[in-house]
Amino acid sequence: MTGGLNKDFDWVVAKFEEMIKRETEVSIAIPTIRILIDVIRKSNSTTVVGLQKELEDAVKQLKSCPYNQSISLSSVCDSFIRFVTKRTELDFPNFDTCKSNLVERGEQLSNKSSMSRTKISQLADKFIRDGVTILVHGFSRVVLGLLLHAAFQGKRFSVIVTESRPDSSGYKTAARLQAANIPVKLIMDGGVSRIIDKVDYVLVGAEAIVENGGIVNKIGTYQISIVAKAFKKPFYVAAESFKFTRSYPLNQSDIENLKNDHISEPFKACRSCSSCENPEQLTIDSPTLDYTPPSYITLLFTELGVLTPSAVSDELIKLYC
């Protein structure tokens, strides 16, 4: 054991990173669930308690891996443990039967997660009408899938995408939409208030949906929601239910307690700027996430249904009880 981690599960991180590199378009939930199913299959434990301990050790390894730059991975792991091991000893007193059933439950969760984006796209389809203009921030595979689904259905709409600094992920979104022949325009992050009167609504993804119905997402999401509310524009969120998390941030500083979300090399252009005499002496704050309170969110599109922020706590109760 080193730093609280069980070295017997080093293979978990190696396999996870391999799957992430190979399957770039899948939800983070899929490789995570597959690996945890493998942990159950490979387990030599002869008791439920021992097997649960192995799963917990594997989860610790996953949560500590270098890839874990978001809180989504933690949410998936917690969802797996909750769903798969719920009331295990009571339901299956025979351990071999119990182990087989845990694998079966894991496969059910994997299949459910695989279909979640399709379900979200279908549920949100009626909100994309011909002629609408949608403002998108950052890169979200759920949001992208939703828009591509609507275009495939023959909907005619246009999209405005923010650059989404500091990683400029908006360029990736814009390129994918352009490749699908969806009219798209890229704008600076600071230009949202300039164009907000031209959009019909805002659509964003989420790294996490918290207990009060608010979201944690790409930095800049909160200020876009403020502008949207000031101009009376609907603010929609599209995300899978595995991103529901039992956390309750009260302000922006609480985000750092959820995840260390600062990037190590922010604003390289600034550091090399010729007008800065000593760029290395600049103090730069570079968070990647912010918290948007539920009062700024109109609806959330999930595979569980189209929810109001106030309905999120009810869904969490169903998931955790």
From Swiss-Prot:
<comment type="function">
    <text>Acts as a component of the translation initiation factor 2B (eIF2B) complex, which catalyzes the exchange of GDP for GTP on eukaryotic initiation factor 2 (eIF2) gamma subunit. Its guanine nucleotide exchange factor activity is repressed when bound to eIF2 complex phosphorylated on the alpha subunit, thereby limiting the amount of methionyl-initiator methionine tRNA available to the ribosome and consequently global translation is repressed.</text>
</comment>
<dbReference type="GO" id="GO:0002183">
    <property type="term" value="P:cytoplasmic translational initiation"/>
</dbReference>
<comment type="similarity">
    <text>Belongs to the eIF-2B alpha/beta/delta subunits family.</text>
</comment>
<dbReference type="GO" id="GO:0003743">
    <property type="term" value="F:translation initiation factor activity"/>
</dbReference>
<dbReference type="GO" id="GO:0005829">
    <property type="term" value="C:cytosol"/>
</dbReference>
<protein>
    <recommendedName>
        <fullName>Translation initiation factor eIF2B subunit alpha</fullName>
    </recommendedName>
</protein>
<dbReference type="GO" id="GO:0005085">
    <property type="term" value="F:guanyl-nucleotide exchange factor activity"/>
</dbReference>
<keyword id="KW-0396">Initiation factor</keyword>
<dbReference type="GO" id="GO:0005851">
    <property type="term" value="C:eukaryotic translation initiation factor 2B complex"/>
</dbReference>
<comment type="subunit">
    <text>Component of the translation initiation factor 2B (eIF2B) complex which is a heterodecamer of two sets of five different subunits: alpha, beta, gamma, delta and epsilon. Subunits alpha, beta and delta comprise a regulatory subcomplex and subunits epsilon and gamma comprise a catalytic subcomplex. Within the complex, the hexameric regulatory complex resides at the center, with the two heterodimeric catalytic subcomplexes bound on opposite sides.</text>
</comment>
<dbReference type="InterPro" id="IPR042529">
    <property type="entry name" value="IF_2B-like_C"/>
</dbReference>
<dbReference type="InterPro" id="IPR000649">
    <property type="entry name" value="IF-2B-related"/>
</dbReference>
<dbReference type="Pfam" id="PF01008">
    <property type="entry name" value="IF-2B"/>
</dbReference>
<keyword id="KW-0963">Cytoplasm</keyword>
<dbReference type="GO" id="GO:0006413">
    <property type="term" value="P:translational initiation"/>
</dbReference>
<dbReference type="InterPro" id="IPR051501">
    <property type="entry name" value="eIF2B_alpha/beta/delta"/>
</dbReference>
<dbReference type="InterPro" id="IPR037171">
    <property type="entry name" value="NagB/RpiA_transferase-like"/>
</dbReference>
<dbReference type="InterPro" id="IPR042528">
    <property type="entry name" value="elF-2B_alpha_N"/>
</dbReference>
<keyword id="KW-0648">Protein biosynthesis</keyword>
